[in-house]
Amino acid sequence: MIELQAINVSFQQKEKTIQAVKQVDLSIAKGDVYGIVGYSGAGKSTLVRVMNLLQKPTSGKVIINGTELGKLSPKELRKERKSIGMIFQHFHLMESRTIFDNVDFSLKYTKKSKQERRQKVNELLTLVGLEEKATAYPKQLSGGQKQRVAIARALASDPQVLLCDEATSALDPKTTHQILALLKKLNQQLGLTIVLITHEMQVVKEICNKVAVMENGEVIEQGSSVQIFSAPKEVLTQEFIRTATHVDQALETICSHRAFADQLTNKWLVELSYVGTQTNEPLIAQLYSKYQVSANILYGNVELLQETPLGRLIVTLSGEIHQREKALAYLIESGVQATILQKNGASKEMKVIQGGR
């Protein structure tokens, strides 16, 4: 569907060359909801603009449905861009026009008759849940409603791809969830391929089936959402995921609050992560029956990501030291990732033990 091959983007600032995107290769399949995540300045917004040549790459190829965009004439490129819709953080609505007219403007230069355009606009407004706001003006709408108008406008040309550049960044959490639910519906109902640019891993977790992580213009890690969330390799990816899963907040509370001090004395504080069918197995209960190691759960979270269960626990382990080591080995053999956070109440450099089958 979308192929980016060896993409580089450089900007000249006086005598200095800024390389915003460095040797990026991406493959996005039809029907994907593909998240590209990174901090500000990572190059993700530049990269998404390359996908429809709003930003021409310094080098590399952009291929959409087998067509290399860089080889098209201006007329051919304009035609190809109709298959690629785009929405932004800011809505760019025309304040003096009604919601109906804002969407209709996208159809102004098509060959559709006035009646066909009216029917199309009404269909789009119904699709995004704004059929009752057709005669309203942008100033009468909330931020979430304005973004729905922008989505309807972007869908006017019946695109196969929708590029979303920080589309939820200006919205509150509840409205963000509603917009993401709408995008998911469009993906499923229309078969729309969506590329989502964001700095929030929570957004990726909620909607994306694949994700790429960018840092300093490079894609440092990419894969399925389940793969990235269950076994992140890069430090930056781990930081993003820990923020999205609230593990660090739980750890801070556990390690700083007096109420937990006695529970950490002469015990190991361990973080456990597991995925898929492992969440169905009573592994914690078996630690005592097999090794006489008691596990006290201080924090736990199980959630579904792309219909796959992901679990995270923070536990204390007590018992004979050699038995604790055997218990950890058993967890690892069962496919659990274990991170020893503290030993006997003393903080230590985290030791990550990766389990897998």
Question: Each PLM stretch: what is its role?
Answer:
Residues 136-139, 156-157, 164:
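Conserved signature/switch motifs of ABC ATPase nucleotide-binding domains
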Residues 68, 104, 108, 115-132:
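Conserved ABC ATPase "signature" region
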Residues 60-68:
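Conserved ABC transporter NBD signature motif
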Residues 52:
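Helix-to-loop junction immediately C-terminal to a conserved catalytic motif
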Residues 222-223, 231:
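ABC ATPase "signature
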Residues 69-85, 109, 114-115, 228-232:
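ABC ATPase NBD coupling module
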Residues 204-206:
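A short, surface-exposed alpha-helical micro-motif characterized by mixed small hydrophobic
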